[in-house]
Amino acid sequence: EVEIKAVADEAAAERLILSLHNELKGFKKNATITSFDVKILTALQQHHSHFKRGLLVEIPLGEYAIELAQQYGCCQIGWKDQLATDEIIKLTHQAKLDISVWTVNDVERAKYLQQLGIQGLITDVPSTMLRSLCL
């Protein structure tokens, strides 16, 4: 997963996407480009990029975030932990989008999210999570 930070404008997004295509040539089938910035997702879509895409969500958009992800051809959503409610995870699954949750440092919370069927977890304590979640 490659997270792309926000860019100033559409032209910057296009330049960045063209650069990514060159720099990540060998990873086009494996890499997922994620961003909070829809300008990045728009540029990926307009360039018919082979990279998988993911929308990162840090503000409470609810179901609208799922609609945005689908609109931009995303295969996943990365929810901020506080936004990853049971209901939003259920709706994201129903939309057939993979789910990652960030930043989860509490083991019990991570176990609960794992039981809900999320596909990815971003944490500041990876060793602890690997031991505790039996991964």
Segments (PLM) and residue ranges:
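Short loop-to-alpha-helix "cap/lid" segments that border enzyme active sites
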Residues: 1-135
